[in-house]
């Protein structure tokens, strides 16, 4: 009898991970126990994924606002510092802004509008149209912004982020000036020392600032790249991918995620006798169709993964085969024809640009699988920071 299930994704309940725990040992033992208790046989191509937050927690990869401030002072001189294009998020940016402000005498905050990089809106496009404001040309002061739009409250959080970020800066002991523009160089009339806080466009922002004459250009990925007074750190991503741990600390993106994934994959493969892949995942790369927010506030979906997860899908479009190429067939004859077509597919030859693959998804496997994991585990109280996936690499012919 042929298999009736394809890809199966399971959230695995795990114990609470604590600083100093072995994320590899706990992940592997938890998954093996779940497979045994539920009579699930491991198969070649299975994937074990663990969320980045528990990896960082086990590593003790944290930093305080004062440690951030110390790094800011050392790298900027601590006078007037520009903070360009942060996202609007209490979880992701409020403590980073406090740390930066603690390390400076004045902060010039440049906010993009009508929304931040990931789609959190200050105002709507319709409001811009009504006010006659061109977001690609017009640079607004706080007074001009308030005159045009008044108080702006985020529809989901109920927070006026303009007022909130201004209060954070001032409560940290720095002067605050807020400017609204979509050209990062608009901050240079105010200061030549800039921390650009965008995530996915940060390299371009750094290049534009440097070319326009900024003297000090940093990104969030240039802060906390090494320990500061005993802090955690991330040599590659710095403060990118961090989020609020408590009222004075952020949890940084995990270090050595590739080594963690490889250790989990090897231990699972050794224990099961099957080829098991592994990854460390963070934010999924999906966009909320209602709120218009792109959920990827981490620098990457998956900071670490095993080699079997490199690449993109190389699939045929079954609908095209059934409706076009084999339109005159039906029943078992159609099934056999499609199966033979799939079996004849050269796995090493890309199908990009070929009609039979049109409508499939030419995205990185790690982005697809990591997004699937993030949607499965959620960000609340499910208690499933480990995801076990079976059948992801199967096709219609696999029994």
Where are the regions that the model predicts?
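Conserved mixed alpha/beta catalytic, RNA-binding, or beta-rich assembly cores of soluble enzyme
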Residues: 2-44, 53-399
């Amino acid at each position: 009898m042929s298999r009736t299930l394809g890809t199966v994704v399971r959230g695995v309940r795990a114990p609470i991970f604590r600083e100093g725990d072995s994320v590899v040992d706990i992940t592997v033992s938890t998954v093996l126990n779940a497979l045994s208790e539920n009579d699930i046989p491991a198969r070649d191509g299975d994937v074990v994924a663990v969320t980045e937050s528990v990896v960082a927690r086990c590593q003790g990869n944290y930093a305080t606002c004062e440690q951030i401030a110390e790094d800011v002072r050392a790298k900027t001189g601590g006078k007037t510092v520009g903070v360009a294009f942060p996202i609007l998020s209490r979880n992701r940016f409020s403590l980073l802004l406090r740390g930066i402000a603690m390390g400076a005498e004045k902060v010039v905050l440049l906010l993009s509008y009508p929304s931040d990089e990931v789609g959190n809106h200050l105002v709507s496009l319709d409001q811009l149209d009504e006010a006659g404001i061109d977001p690609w040309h017009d640079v607004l002061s706080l007074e001009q912004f308030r005159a045009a739009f008044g108080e702006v409250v985020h529809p989901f959080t109920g927070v006026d982020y303009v007022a909130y970020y201004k209060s954070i800066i001032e409560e940290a002991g720095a002067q605050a000036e807020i400017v609204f523009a979509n050209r990062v160089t608009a901050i240079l009339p105010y200061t030549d020392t800039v921390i650009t806080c965008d995530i996915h466009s940060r390299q371009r922002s750094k290049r534009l600032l440097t070319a326009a004459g900024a003297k000090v250009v940093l990104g969030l990925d240039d802060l906390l790249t090494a320990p500061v007074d005993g802090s955690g750190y991330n040599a590659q991503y710095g403060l990118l991918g961090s989020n609020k741990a408590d009222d004075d600390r952020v949890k940084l993106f995990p270090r050595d995620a590739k080594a963690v994934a490889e250790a989990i994959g090897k231990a699972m493969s050794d224990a099961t006798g099957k080829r098991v892949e592994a990854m460390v995942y963070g934010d999924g790369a999906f966009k909320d169709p209602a709120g218009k927010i792109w959920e990827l506030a981490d620098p990457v979906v998956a900071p670490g993964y095993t080699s079997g997860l490199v690449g993109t899908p190389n699939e045929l479009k079954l609908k095209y085969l059934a409706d076009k190429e084999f339109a005159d067939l039906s029943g078992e004859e159609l099934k056999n024809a499609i199966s033979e077509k799939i079996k004849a597919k050269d796995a090493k030859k890309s199908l990009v640009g070929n009609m039979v693959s049109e409508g499939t998804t030419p995205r990185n496997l790690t982005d697809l699988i990591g997004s699937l994991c993030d949607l499965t585990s959620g960000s609340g109280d499910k208690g499933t920071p480990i995801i076990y996936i079976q059948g992801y690499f199967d096709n219609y012919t696999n029994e």
